[in-house]
Curated annotation (Swiss-Prot):
This is Olfactory receptor 2A12. The keyword Glycoprotein applies. The lineage of its organism: Eukaryota, Metazoa, Chordata, Craniata, Vertebrata. It is a multi-pass membrane protein. It comes from the Eukaryota. It comes from Homo sapiens (Human). Pfam families: 7tm_4 (PF13853). Glycans are attached at residue 4. Residues 49-56, 120-138, 219-235, 292-310 are cytoplasmic. GO terms for molecular function: G protein-coupled receptor activity; olfactory receptor activity. GO terms for cellular component: plasma membrane.
Length: 310
């Protein structure tokens, strides 16, 4: 490296680059969504913990999804909110890399947890007689733990490759957080290896699991159509359609973000996609997948009735 090159110690997050009045509006809007994300997922966690009827594999995975969603949003949104009301929109380099690591780790964990939830529904509907044998507590614990451990290890691989690069500028990131592809642009060296590893990892984490999900749901659809009871068929369709909606929203936006050609969308559209699956998707999960669920509603009524009678 040339002697006149200097290592950057802080990064400027350009954010949304809008008028100050609009920044205040966005601050209030995003703060509301972030608060609802924490509240909605927190309610789900509390209900699953308090109500023994929800101590089933499906809701164990759902509790992990709620934790991931809260962590996922909290890795980026607080700094984004702070930058919307601060004149100096900077972040030190070490916290920037930490933010990249946490964001990647939680994103990968969410992908894998969604796949585990799909597997749980597949076993419940296609192999109902063996469900309690296949999806026992030991299996659920191993599957959930594997999701978390593998996700953080894969994120660590990306961060290790990033830290091998020399960072001497530019100092600005045209994003509202330290998104990994934006961090690549800070390096004053060839990042093709990083980009290849990121693309390969995205294909492995996004395309592969999504194909498994779609194949599983084809089997689930066939099994549902064979159910004789109309009520049972409606309940199965309701649960599975909710999960498929969540999977489609998350995987679809992530695939467009990380695997579509660069020329297909501008940096501003990339920010909107990032905003969707870092802020909007975590609030949609409890609404789509839980709060419309009769068992969750019943658990909420029981908890409120218990509190009222005390």
């Amino acid at each position: 490296m040339e002697s006149n090159q200097t290592w950057i110690t802080e990064v400027i997050l350009l954010g949304f680059q809008v008028d100050p009045a609009l920044e205040l509006f966005l601050f209030g809007f995003f703060l509301l969504f972030y608060s609802l994300t924490l509240m909605g997922n927190g309610i789900i966690l509390g209900l699953i913990y308090l109500d023994s009827r929800l101590h089933t594999p499906m809701y164990v995975f759902l509790s992990h999804l709620a934790i991931v969603d809260m962590s996922y949003a909290s890795s980026t949104v607080p700094k984004m909110l702070a930058n919307l009301v601060m004149h100096k929109k900077v972040i030190s380099f070490a916290p920037c890399i930490l933010q990249t690591f946490l964001y990647l780790a939680f994103a990968i964990t969410e992908c894998l947890i969604l796949v585990m939830m799909c597997y749980d529904r597949y076993v419940a509907i296609c192999h109902p007689l063996q469900y309690t044998l296949i999806m026992n507590w030991r299996v659920c614990t191993v599957l959930a733990s594997t999701c978390w451990i593998f996700s953080f290890l894969l994120a660590l691989v990306h961060i290790t490759l990033i830290l091998r690069l020399p960072f001497c500028g530019p100092q600005k990131i045209n994003h509202f957080f330290c998104q990994i592809m934006s961090v690549f642009k800070l390096a004053c060296a060839d990042t093709r290896l990083n980009q290849v590893v990121l693309f390969a990892g995205s294909a492995f984490i996004l395309v592969g699991p999504l194909c498994l999900v779609l194949v599983s749901y084809l089997h689930i659809l066939v099994a549902i159509l064979r159910i004789q009871s109309g009520e049972g068929r409606r309940k199965a369709f309701s649960t599975c359609s909710s999960h498929l909606c969540v999977v489609g929203l998350f995987f679809g936006s992530a695939i467009v973000m990380y695997m579509a050609p660069k020329s297909s969308h501008s940096q501003e559209r990339r920010k909107i996609l990032s905003l969707f699956y870092s802020l909007f998707n975590p609030i949609l999960n409890p609404l789509i997948y839980s709060l419309r669920n009769a068992e969750v509603k019943g658990a909420l009524k029981r908890v409120l009735w218990k509190q009222r009678s005390m």
